[in-house]
Amino acid sequence: MATVPTRSGSPRQLTTKQTGDAWEVQARRWLEGKGLRFIAANVNERGGEIDLIMREGRTTVFVEVRYRRSALYGGAAASVTRSKQHKLLQTARLWLARHNGSFDTVDCRFDVVAFTGNEVEWIKDAFNDHS
């Protein structure tokens, strides 16, 4: 778990949620630097959450953000399992429906931004609704 210095100078532990939120902010900034436009963060629908929703041109990009301290056990990108992909697809389907869209009517893709140690990997179109 990550630590952060406090005003008293002694470090305190970050919760898993705080660590995840911090990496999601990093991913958002990094993607904005690559030209994507922010739409939403931490979108919750029945059964799942999407970390970031961005736009690249006319494409809606659903982004899963992952962080691992090291590549031991496969690193961050390897942690997006089939089960997680299924949840992301279902959540995106519900979000699109709430915004009068569907996979048939909206150009979209699923990306993974994986931070492993100090390295960042952007996997465009990491999976799709046909996976």
UniProtKB/Swiss-Prot annotation:
Pfam family, one: UPF0102
Comp. bias (Polar residues): 1-19
Domain of life per record: Bacteria
GO molecular function, one term: nucleic acid binding
Disordered, as annotated region: 1-20
Cross-referenced InterPro entries: Restrct_endonuc-II-like, tRNA_endonuc-like_dom_sf, UPF0102_YraN-like
NCBIfam families named among the record's database cross-references: PRK12497.1-3, YraN family protein
Alphabetized PANTHER family for the sequence: UPF0102 PROTEIN YRAN (PTHR34039:SF1)
Family, as annotated: Belongs to the UPF0102 family.
Name under which the protein is recorded: UPF0102 protein YraN
Organism: Escherichia coli O17:K52:H18 (strain UMN026 / ExPEC)
Taxonomic path: Bacteria, Pseudomonadati, Pseudomonadota, Gammaproteobacteria, Enterobacterales
